[in-house]
Amino acid sequence: MGSSRAPWMGRVGGHGMMALLLAGLLLPGTLAKSIGTFSDPCKDPMRITSPNDPCLTGKGDSSGFSSYSGSSSSGSSISSARSSGGGSSGSSSGSSIAQGGSAGSFKPGTGYSQVSYSSGSGSSLQGASGSSQLGSSSSHSGSSGSHSGSSSSHSSSSSSFQFSSSSFQVGNGSALPTNDNSYRGILNPSQPGQSSSSSQTFGVSSSGQSVSSNQRPCSSDIPDSPCSGGPIVSHSGPYIPSSHSVSGGQRPVVVVVDQHGSGAPGVVQGPPCSNGGLPGKPCPPITSVDKSYGGYEVVGGSSDSYLVPGMTYSKGKIYPVGYFTKENPVKGSPGVPSFAAGPPISEGKYFSSNPIIPSQSAASSAIAFQPVGTGGVQLCGGGSTGSKGPCSPSSSRVPSSSSISSSSGLPYHPCGSASQSPCSPPGTGSFSSSSSSQSSGKIILQPCGSKSSSSGHPCMSVSSLTLTGGPDGSPHPDPSAGAKPCGSSSAGKIPCRSIRDILAQVKPLGPQLADPEVFLPQGELLDSP
């Protein structure tokens, strides 16, 4: 019996060994792709990317997470799943809005697709990258009178917002996974009067917000359109005028908050905010995140009457670019950081590179800004030809008579117009405040860290209006905010208070971080008070 059993065991053992050998050959090509995602640091979804990250500079494996969104026939249940295929260039992630499962919750590890927040009657979400859409084209979103499509569609509701062809670009492959029973949202108020939407709606607030993520090649004849090669992001709403934009390849200005629900209609049920807050409402801003995540600080505010560089406005609150929570810190996939402000940078450096273009909306005063660089505000070079001066985007509709004048007395002109050279001449480096009267409601802040005035970099004059909140939350000039004169240093630095010090004078304010150095440009010392 033993002799008859041995060959059978041998055959089984042989088959078993063969199976093991085959598995050993197949595993590296199949399971290793998913296992390697976490063994390879470049594929680790918990990895934090930085500007000189070898995974971004081509020294590491650039393949990362892409995700797909499934769409039901009614567009009411959109699920997200993770796929380890391909790089980010051809994937649909980032331009897909995903809702995890029928319970409406996002779970870490289930997918790394863009998660957006929308709320109110007639508001909806659309992800249109040419390869994946949320919802079917035959479904309509409530009372907004809009239909879904791969590009923008129009809405008759004046309270809805547009994030479509000329408005907002969501980074490809952005990821915002959250804890169980809650979802991470992106609040993006944009231009009123239009809505690019499908039928996927959920959220808390009452004003319609629509988010569309359109990715397409850049076009020179559409200067303000978002594109895959470096978007120009327009950001406006009931308060912020259309001249508020970020360009020059900057990532979109977005606000990320955790949403929790407790019985409100259409709200995902979830745990209460870790730092307080009303049920069913956005959690209050977290004070800060670890320095390893870029040292971002949340400087909150409850007034809708002011905005400063690097901050964005949504639903009556002001948040900084790149806002995220400590419980769900920023995550990224190779080549595609998940937070909207781009790789971790000093907030002070970001602020100082964004001169402010005051403009005025119909309702109240506003601050608009663009970064110095390719697109946006540019400075005239000394004697160089073809350099554009400071200008406002052609879509801003800000008349030159009401915009800031340079120290030479020449007003700003729309970018691309015949007059492209008005700028602050080298050696002056300050804007004239003559056209920035208080009566016009314009607000000017002094960007700290500007280099020497001889290089033509702008800084605001000592008479510029710094902010303080009035009883009604409206901005008022406050000389005590601490801005110092520009150009008073012989070392080529502009001694001025950091943006955090200025913000500290603005009331009401949210939590403050005790380390203002994260708001200073790299290599610059903090002024002693």
From Swiss-Prot:
Q: InterPro entries, per this entry?
A: Corneodesmosin
Query: What does the entry give for GO biological process?
Result: cell-cell adhesion; skin morphogenesis
Q: Where is this region: Disordered?
A: 38-248, 383-492
Chief place where the protein resides = secreted
Q: Where in the cell is it found?
A: Secreted
The signal peptide, as residue positions, is: 1-32
What do the Gene Ontology cellular component annotations say? Answer: extracellular region
Give the compositionally biased regions (Polar residues): 449-467
Q: Name one GO molecular function term.
A: protein homodimerization activity
Residues linked to a glycan: 172
Q: Spell out the Low complexity composition-biased ranges.
A: 58-83, 90-100, 111-175, 189-231, 392-408, 426-441
Protein role: Important for the epidermal barrier integrity.
Spell out the protein name for this chain. Answer: Corneodesmosin
The coding gene here is CDSN
